[in-house]
Amino acid sequence: MKEIVIRAATREDAEGIITHIIDISSEPDIYVSYTPEEANIPVEPKSDRIKQHLEMGNLYLVAEAEGKIIAEFTCLVDHSYAITRHTAVLGMSVDREYRNQGIGTRLMKAAIDWARDKRIGRLELEVYAENVAAIHLYEKFGFEVEGRKRNYAYQRDRYYDSLIMSRLFI
C-alpha cells in the first residue's frame, strides 16, 4: 500500500489540486457539482485562493501519495458576517483508487479537531443523496440530515437531489 500523507495545503499545491478536481469531475458516476471544464481554472487564482483561506484560519488539507494530490479537504468559515462566523462549510473529494482506505476518516477527524480548537459551533455540508458512502462517513462523525434539495443538480441527463447535513458543537 502506498504511503498517504495528509498535510496542510500550500500555494504550491494549486496545480495538483486542479488536476485532482478535473480527474474526479471526469468520473462517470462521481457526485460533484461541476464539470471538468469548470474545474480547469488557472493556477494563479487557485493559488491565491489557497493562500487567502489559510490566512483566514480556515482548514485546507490535501492528501498526497507518491507526490500526487489524491484528496482535497476544506472547512471554510465565511468571515463576511459576524452572525455566522461560528459555522464552517466542509468539502471533500478523494480520488477513486484511494477511496475506502480510511482517508475520509482521517480527514474528518482533522475537521472535528479543528472545529473544536477554533470553537466552531456548526460544521455543515451538502452531499448528493445517492452518495451513500459519503453519507455513511458523515453520519459516523455525528452529522445529521437537516434537509433535502430536490432536483439540485442536472448531470448525465437526469436530476439529483442533495442533502444538507450538519454537526453541532454547541
Feature locations, PLM:
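Conserved GNAT acetyl-CoA-binding A-motif
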Residues: M108, A115-E126
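Acetyl-CoA-dependent GNAT
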Residues: S25, E38-E97, M108-K109, L168-I170
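Glycine-rich phosphate/pyrophosphate-binding loop shared by adenosine-nucleotide-utilizing enzymes
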Residues: K2-I4, E66-E72, Y160
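Hydrophobic adenine-recognition pocket in adenosine-nucleotide-binding enzymes
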Residues: A9, M92-V94, V127
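Helix-loop element at the rim of GNAT/NAT acetyltransferase active sites that forms part
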Residues: T19-E37
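Conserved active-site alpha-helix within GNAT-family acetyltransferase domains
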Residues: Q101, T105, E130-G147
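Conserved N-terminal entry element of GNAT/NAT acetyltransferase domains
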Residues: M1-E15, L163, I170
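Conserved catalytic-core motifs of GNAT/GCN5-like acyltransferases
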Residues: E124-V127, E139, E144-Y160
